[in-house]
Amino acid sequence: MNHRLSALVNGGFLSENEANKLMHDMMSGFLTDAEVAASLSILAHRGETAEEMTGFVKAMRQNAAPMERALDVVDTCGTGGDGLSTFNISTAAAIVRSAAGAKIAKHGNRSVSSKSGSADVLECLGIHIQSTPEETRRQIQEKNMGFLFAPLYHSSMKQVAAVRKQLGFRTVFNLLGPLCHPMQAKKQIIGVYSKEKAKLMAEALAPLEPEHVLFVCGEDGLDELTITANSYVIELKKDVMTEYTLNPEDFGLQKGYLSEIQVQSPEESAKLIQNILNHQTEGAPLHITALNAGAALYVAGKSESLMAGTLKAIETIKNGAAKEQLARLKQKTREEEIYA
């Protein structure tokens, strides 16, 4: 038995270095499926430590496909797993904030447990998702937004894919995904399904020199800034961590209902997003998109506050800029035509 796994089995905790090596063993295929399943099950049962998480993140970043990190980008990504079947809020918000001037490197995947993953809905919107790293950089430079399809950058995850599917419950990989952006984005909005895990992820990311990151969790269980209740926020700005609660009504946004933002398929999600960007819908769908887009504009340094960012996002939708941005993102480059 792998000695690091043995330590877990015997109730021990791993140092950052030990966790790093255990993750490398998983990613390299050195562990058997039974050993991977045992490791993930033990961690899920007792909970991961921040030190272990930092070691895991470093290993996953080291195993990811290399990509130049010169661009000043913002990512919005979530752990998923909230089970609330909402439309792809962070994807809609990404389009809005890219229309407002922020450079977005959207990291995502197809759906695993939700009704619609970010890759699924972008395809339904007619946006190419499987671009090369070079093409993605050009998209970000020229259109302010590019999509980083996770399987293209984290191919070593195939070593644990079958085990994760068989286990059928949340594992540490749900938490690691948002922390392992291929461009190692220093500015992020990370949605988390619980306050406890948000705090854990913030503590794990802090030693890795983030510039400005918001970890957000709705009191309704949504892994976004929500419109139906208050939201819990951990703001990590360089080495300063601040915790606070946001009430959407403080932003002049009327609280809505989950039923107003729930969908049953990627196609339904895409249709709602189009209506939002075309300013053909009001209420909760528009407000939750603007709230999350505004948060990223704040993190990107395009707005002085969350309030100012939210107002800017609403104006970006109302003046037609978001609609125009969607049309730009749909336009294929010559390279995309070749690989389509």
Curated annotation (Swiss-Prot):
Coiled coil location: none
InterPro entries reported in the protein's UniProt record: Anthranilate_Pribosyl_Tfrase (IPR005940), Glycosyl_Trfase_fam3 (IPR000312), Glycosyl_Trfase_fam3_N_dom (IPR017459), Glycosyl_Trfase_fam3_N_dom_sf (IPR036320), Nuc_phospho_transferase (IPR035902)
Record-listed Mg(2+) 2 binding positions: D223, E224
EC code(s) of this entry: 2.4.2.18
Domain of life, per lineage: Bacteria
Annotated residues for binding of Mg(2+) 1: S90, E224
Positions of 5-phospho-alpha-D-ribose 1-diphosphate binding: 78, 81-82, 86, 88-91, 106-114, 118
UniProt keyword Transferase present: yes
One example GO MF annotation: magnesium ion binding
Residues involved in anthranilate 2 binding: R164
Sorted UniProt keywords: Amino-acid biosynthesis, Aromatic amino acid biosynthesis, Glycosyltransferase, Magnesium, Metal-binding, Transferase, Tryptophan biosynthesis
Matches recorded under Pfam families: Glycos_trans_3N, Glycos_transf_3
Catalytic activity field: N-(5-phospho-beta-D-ribosyl)anthranilate + diphosphate = 5-phospho-alpha-D-ribose 1-diphosphate + anthranilate
Cofactor: how and how many bound: Binds 2 magnesium ions per monomer.
Annotated metabolic or biological route of this protein: Amino-acid biosynthesis; L-tryptophan biosynthesis; L-tryptophan from chorismate: step 2/5
Protein's GO biological process: L-tryptophan biosynthetic process
Family: Belongs to the anthranilate phosphoribosyltransferase family.
PANTHER family: ANTHRANILATE PHOSPHORIBOSYLTRANSFERASE
Subunit relationships: Homodimer.
Protein name (Swiss-Prot/TrEMBL): Anthranilate phosphoribosyltransferase
